[in-house]
């Protein structure tokens, strides 16, 4: 997965690190206006948004080449949009978490952020 244009300075949910397990609905990052430019937030992006991509990598040498395989995530995002989880904001920390926890096989799922 590829996420771009995240929030400046604190793009990811607090305490989230590579390799953590997350559950559907967990907040993992925050939309922003960052991007490819020499100076942060001066790339012509005026609205905060998320650039989401999914790349298949079978061989690390294929990354950043003309042989990249990118998946059209339009159908995936449609399903996600129809099944959003409500979140709440902690005004003190400015972090968001999933409002409702859920059960999987009678085990309470809290994920990395909730």
Sequence positions of predicted segments:
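Short histidine-centered loop motifs in beta-beta connectors
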Residues: 1-25
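Structural recognition of the beta-strand scaffold that forms the well-ordered cores
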Residues: 1-5, 29-30, 51-53
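A mature extracytoplasmic/lumenal domain signature
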Residues: 5-8, 35, 54-56
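Generic alpha-helical propensity signal that fires on short helical segments
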Residues: 9-11, 19, 40, 46, ...
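Extracytoplasmic/secreted cell-surface and envelope-processing proteins
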Residues: 12-13, 37-39, 61-63
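Glycine-rich loops and low-complexity Gly/Arg-rich segments
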Residues: 15-18, 26-29, 53-55, 77-80
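Short hydrophobic beta/alpha edge segments that flank linear recognition/processing sites
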Residues: 22-40
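Acidic, glycine-rich catalytic/binding loops that coordinate metals and/or anionic ligands
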Residues: 42-114
